[in-house]
C-alpha cells in the first residue's frame, strides 16, 4: 500500500488506476468455509500490483530507480487482451468458481488470470487430492501436479493474514480480538509486577 501511495504521488497518477489483484477478488459468501484455502492459493497473486499498459514504462523506471524497502510484484495489464475463460468442469468445484470479481475495467484481466491461477479442484480429503493434478483441501494443502505445499506459519482460518477483497472488516475484528487478549496479558503482568514491588517494600 505504501509503495502504491508513493508511486502515484511521485508520478502524479490516479491511485484508482492501480489495484492490487486481491482487492478485486472476493470469496463468495456461500462458500465462506473455503476462504482460508483460497487465501493460501491466491496470496501471491493477491499481493500483485496491476499496472495498466499506458503507465508501465514510467512505473518500471520509478521502481528500478529506488530502493523500495519491501518486496513488490507487479503485472503489466495489456490494453487489449484475448480473454481466457475458465473451462467448465464436471465432478466438483474449482477454486475460480467460488470467487466473485469486482466489476470494472480489470474484470476481464482478472478472470483470465484466475483461469490458470485458480483452477484447483476443491477437495474434502487426501483421497480426492490424489485424483487431481491441481487441488486444494479445506485445510490449505495445495497440490500442483507433483508439487505439494502447506504453509502453516499461520492458521488457515486466521483472518489477520487474509488479503482478498476490499473490506477489512474480518481482519479488523481479528486484530481487535488479539489486541483485547494482549491488553489482558499486559494487565495481568502489571498486576504481578505491582505485587512483587509491594512485597519488596514490606
Where are the predicted features?
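Extended alpha-helical coiled-coil "stalk/arm" regions
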Residues: 1-6, 181-202
Amino acid at each position: 500500500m505504501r509503495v502504491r501511495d508513493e508511486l502515484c504521488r511521485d508520478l502524479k497518477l490516479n491511485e484508482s488506476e492501480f489495484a492490487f489483484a486481491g482487492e478485486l477478488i472476493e470469496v463468495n459468501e456461500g462458500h465462506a468455509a473455503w476462504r482460508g484455502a483460497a487465501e493460501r492459493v491466491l496470496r501471491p497473486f493477491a499481493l500483485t500490483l496491476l499496472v495498466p499498459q499506458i503507465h508501465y514504462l514510467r512505473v518500471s523506471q520509478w521502481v528500478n530507480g529506488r530502493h523500495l524497502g519491501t518486496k513488490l510484484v507487479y503485472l503489466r495489464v495489456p490494453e487489449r487482451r484475448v480473454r481466457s475463460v475458465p473451462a467448465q468442469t464436471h465432478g466438483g468445484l474449482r477454486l475460480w468458481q467460488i470467487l466473485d470479481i469486482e466489476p470494472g475495467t480489470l474484470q476481464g484481466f482478472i478472470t483470465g488470470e484466475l483461469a490458470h491461477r485458480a483452477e484447483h479442484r476443491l477437495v474434502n480429503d487426501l483421497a480426492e487430492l490424489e485424483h487431481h493434478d491441481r487441488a486444494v483441501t479445506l485445510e490449505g494443502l495445495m497440490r500442483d501436479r507433483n508439487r505439494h505445499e502447506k504453509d502453516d506459519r499461520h492458521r488457515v482460518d486466521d483472518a489477520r493474514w487474509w488479503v482478498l477483497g476490499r473490506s477489512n472488516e474480518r481482519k479488523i475484528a481479528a486484530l481487535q480480538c488479539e489486541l483485547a487478549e494482549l491488553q489482558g496479558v499486559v494487565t495481568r503482568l502489571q498486576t504481578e509486577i505491582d505485587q512483587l514491588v509491594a512485597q519488596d517494600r514490606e
